[in-house]
């Protein structure tokens, strides 16, 4: 018996009305369904002789991206109608490309390769749902309006005698279309326009799934039982969810190429449960999580996913021209794309509509292909539509995203997951208009107007392009009610303590708790208490301090600081600080280098070489421009000798003298240059997250000899470049180049002490096979290079592929020289000229130091294990003067990585 596959069109987004159908598109008869005209939903019938089971058992695409999506236009009291289900034949096999649409509307979708579909609408007339595909009888089912409906169709095959057709692949026309899309990229991409101004409305929503399972406890139900009145159901996953956050933002967006402008002025914003002065508002506009498919790659949570419109799209996708439509009087191609065979990187699966005259993107619907090597994301859907402005210009119309965040990729009714939704509406575009002068003067890429969080309900009613549904309006009331439940505040405090490291009260926060207890060979057991004031005391000033005691050295240590936030946006902060504490000189910048119980446990034996440091500083941080951040500081520092890091100087050919301490009086200036960098702004902190461009830092330090003993005058300069180079599909590289020089005569604690790692914890800012105080220079240059392949190779191995491991290679190198006046190597010809003799084992770099490593990251989505080999300086001089193999020729490290 011959089995045949019936193909239709996989359509997501706007369903063509009868007047939009291209009569010459080649459809056969028998597709229509009276009284409604037949939608253009089937490809010219292609009958392929093969077993149905082999065709229909292809896996469906689905994975995730964080988004905050909204619904379509409707009245203030309109409710959203949601439908989800599956279309099968009489034997239960899923049918792909079946048109599922609401009768007498332009709303419809197509089933995926497993026969699944989902959609939602605010259209109050949508009550009859139809499933239609050539070769089967149409089926109509009435659904409940304004509610969630799960509707499964079981289509009956039409008994029609048809002759099998022989199909030969010919993708020359498809390649020509893709080439034309690439040729017209400059004119169709809105971001390549010289200037434009537009209004945006962004709505985000965060939902919690399986809420009933999480609140089974009687006490929880007694306190939070009322929230179940606000439950809803997702049309994508079919899961019931509890809305926990909603935000709305109305903004004006400015874009320009020459002069370069990329700014957003937020005119109004409100977030359920948050006050008007919150740090989250800066991320609620349209500037973040951009989905411009004209770019070669879409950056989703720092994962580069090839765009179906990419010039090299044929490497990642197989394309199928499935239809030609007449949309708004213009011929439009419908193109399906599926991941190419053998692709191990993250890719999309979906469909797009391309204008046949301008080769511009009209609509696109994508899902992240299931099995993609992305953590914490189970489902992802991106929908984007563009509109014609004027006669020949394409511009944004709507951008919708959906994501299911979960700790497991499996469906489970017991584990909670979060659904993120975002929808952006673009309105009133004006092309060719430059930004106003006052906008160009704004020092930040996202500017929040002072009255943005104080807009009333009447203002919002007029500002929205469509009204909120009743359920959406109730989210604000529900979140406010939850905040008044005492148990909620207790749970919030526990979670906040774990995340921030501080136990907060209304006016004071105790911590960080990770430093309460630690131990080292100088202090022995060490206990520390500390804390800082909270914004409940002041949002302009913050006091912090700590007190520590070592039971072995029997000494108290301590410190404190006063921060004065002059301006949060742009940043202007003045800080006064002082402390006396044990510090490790020559360490990297990793947070794991700070004193804690974990670093104490994982410290290599004999690697601790801490020094007591007494320092006072006044520092001024100033964000002059978004691309230029500066820091100016006056620092007074004194470093003390101890038995592990002794300070001695040569007084004669046969004698040395003990030096108690050395000091410096520094003027420190740092300038940091970056472009289009994403930052977070807290009340007192500013953190740098990401930039697609190199970040250059210039560090200048001048020191003058004062009235204290053993002080020195010198000048130190250092320039560094940090760049994350994206190389999809083979991952991304992190490159850091540094060069510096010290002019003057200085003791060894003030030289460039090349960064060692005294622990088994991965520190990407230090040399894993190098000890503290092993090498020093006064002229140096270094290279840190790390490449993460993102599973490019391991993803091709069947059994390992499911583990989602990611391969990493690392190269670290440094070369430096030491002038005679600073060469304090014991026994060297010029050691008597140096201010201090070097500690035993410390020397200069007489040749480049190189180490390399290989590792596997994303183990259990948390851990990373690396193995490093020391390629040079493998022999070191022992205490008896004999050269021996370094004990650090091979080192294994472990680290934590939380990445998507």
Question: How would you name each of these model-derived features?
Answer:
Residues 106-116:
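Short, acidic Ser/Thr/Gly-rich low-complexity loop/linker segments typical of extracellular
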Residues 102-104, 130-141:
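A short, solvent-exposed loop/turn motif at the edges and junctions
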Residues 93-96, 118-126:
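Short Pro-Gly-centered beta-turn/loop motif in secreted/extracellular proteins
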Residues 298-305, 441-900:
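Exposed, low-structure sequence patches enriched in small/polar residues
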Residues 98-102, 128-129, 167, 198, ...:
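Hydrophobic beta-strand segments
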Residues 143-169:
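Extracellular beta-sheet/turn segments enriched in Thr/Pro/Gly and aliphatic residues
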Residues 159, 168-332, 339-347, 408-409, ...:
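Structured extracytoplasmic
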Residues 81-95:
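Structural motif
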């Amino acid at each position: 018996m011959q089995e045949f596959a019936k193909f239709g069109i996989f359509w997501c987004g706007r369903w063509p009305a009868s007047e939009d159908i291209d009569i010459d598109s080649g459809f056969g008869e028998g597709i229509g369904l009276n009284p409604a005209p037949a939608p253009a939903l089937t490809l010219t019938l292609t009958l392929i002789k093969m077993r149905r089971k082999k065709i229909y058992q292809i896996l469906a695409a689905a994975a995730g991206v964080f988004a905050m999506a909204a619904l379509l236009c409707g009245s203030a009291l309109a409710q959203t109608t949601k439908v989800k289900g599956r279309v099968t034949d009489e034997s239960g096999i899923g049918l792909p490309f079946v048109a599922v649409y609401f009768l007498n509307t332009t709303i419809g979708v197509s089933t995926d390769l497993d026969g699944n579909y989902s959609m939602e609408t605010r259209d109050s007339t949508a009550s009859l749902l139809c499933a239609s595909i050539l070769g089967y009888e149409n089926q109509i089912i009435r659904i409940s309006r304004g509610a969630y409906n799960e509707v499964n169709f079981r289509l009956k095959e039409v008994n029609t005698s048809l002759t099998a057709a022989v199909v030969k692949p010919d993708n020359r026309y498809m390649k020509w279309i893709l080439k034309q899309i690439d040729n017209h990229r400059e004119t169709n991409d809105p971001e390549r326009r010289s200037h434009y101004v537009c209004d945006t409305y962004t709505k985000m929503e965060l939902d919690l799934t399986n809420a009933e399972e999480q609140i089974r406890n009687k006490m929880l139900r007694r306190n939070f039982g009322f929230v179940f009145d606000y439950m809803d159901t997702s049309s994508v996953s079919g899961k019931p969810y509890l809305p926990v956050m909603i935000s709305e933002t109305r903004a004006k967006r400015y874009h320009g190429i020459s002069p370069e402008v990329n700014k957003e002025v937020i005119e109004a914003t409100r977030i359920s449960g948050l006050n008007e002065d919150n740090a989250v508002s800066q991320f609620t506009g349209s500037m973040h999580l951009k989905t411009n498919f004209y770019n070669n790659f879409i950056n989703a949570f720092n994962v580069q996913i090839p765009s179906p419109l990419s010039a090299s799209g044929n490497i990642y996708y197989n394309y199928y021209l499935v239809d030609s439509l007449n949309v708004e009087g213009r011929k439009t191609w419908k193109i399906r794309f599926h991941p190419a065979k053998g692709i191990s990187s993250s890719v999309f699966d979906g469909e797009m509509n391309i204008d046949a005259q301008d080769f511009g993107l009209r609509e696109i619907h994508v899902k992240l292909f299931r099995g993609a090597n992305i953590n914490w994301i189970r489902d992802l859907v991106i929908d984007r539509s563009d509109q014609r402005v004027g006669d020949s210009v394409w511009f944004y119309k709507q951008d919708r995203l959906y994501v299911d965040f979960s700790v497991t990729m499996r469906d489970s009714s017991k584990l909670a997951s979060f659904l993120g939704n975002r929808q952006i509406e673009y309105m009133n575009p004006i092309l060719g208009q430059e930004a106003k002068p006052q906008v160009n003067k704004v020092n930040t890429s996202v500017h929040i107007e002072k009255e943005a969080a104080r807009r009333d309900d009447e203002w919002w009613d007029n500002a929205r392009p469509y009204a909120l549904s009743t359920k959406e309006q109730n989210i604000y009331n529900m979140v406010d009610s939850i905040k008044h439940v005492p148990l909620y505040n207790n749970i919030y405090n526990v979670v906040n303590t774990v995340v921030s490291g501080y136990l907060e009260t209304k006016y004071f926060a105790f911590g960080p708790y990770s430093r309460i207890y630690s131990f080292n060979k100088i202090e022995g057991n060490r206990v520390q208490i500390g804390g800082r004031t909270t914004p409940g005391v002041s949002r302009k000033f913050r006091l912090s301090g700590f007190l520590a005691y070592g039971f072995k050295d029997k000494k108290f240590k301590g410190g404190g600081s006063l921060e004065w936030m002059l301006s949060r946006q742009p940043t202007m902060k003045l800080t006064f600080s002082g402390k006396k504490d044990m510090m490790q000189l020559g360490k990297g910048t990793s947070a794991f280098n700070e004193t804690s119980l974990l670093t104490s446990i994982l410290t290599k034996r004999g690697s601790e070489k801490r020094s007591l440091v007494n320092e006072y500083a006044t520092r001024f941080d100033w964000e002059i421009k978004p691309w230029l951040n500066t820091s100016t500081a006056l620092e007074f520092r004194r470093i003390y000798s101890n038995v592990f890091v002794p300070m001695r100087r040569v007084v004669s050919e046969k004698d040395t003298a003990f030096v108690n301490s050395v000091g410096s009086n520094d003027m420190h200036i740092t300038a940091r240059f970056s472009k289009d960098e994403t930052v977070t702004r807290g009340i007192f902190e500013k953190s740098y997250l990401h930039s697609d461009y190199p970040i250059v830092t210039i560090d200048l330090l001048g020191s003058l000899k004062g009235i204290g003993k053993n002080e020195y005058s010198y000048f130190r300069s250092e320039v560094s470049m940090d760049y994350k180079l994206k190389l999809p599909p083979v991952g991304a590289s992190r490159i850091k180049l540094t060069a510096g020089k010290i002019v003057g005569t200085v003791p060894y604690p003030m030289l460039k002490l090349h960064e060692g790692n005294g622990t088994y914890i991965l520190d990407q800012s230090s040399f894993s096979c190098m000890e503290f105080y092993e090498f020093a220079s006064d002229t140096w240059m270094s290279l840190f290079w790390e490449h993460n392949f993102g599973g490019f190779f391991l993803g091709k191995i069947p059994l390992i592929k499911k583990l989602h491991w990611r391969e990493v290679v690392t190269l670290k190198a440094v070369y430096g020289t030491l002038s005679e006046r600073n060469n304090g190597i014991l026994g060297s010809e010029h050691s008597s000229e140096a201010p201090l003799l070097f500690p035993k084992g410390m020397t200069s770099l007489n040749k480049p130091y190189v180490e390399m490593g290989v590792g596997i990251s994303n183990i259990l989505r948390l851990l990373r294990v690396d193995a490093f080999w020391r390629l040079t300086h493998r022999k070191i001089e022992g205490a008896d003067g004999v050269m021996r193999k370094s004990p650090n020729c091979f080192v294994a490290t472990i680290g934590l990585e939380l990445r998507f």
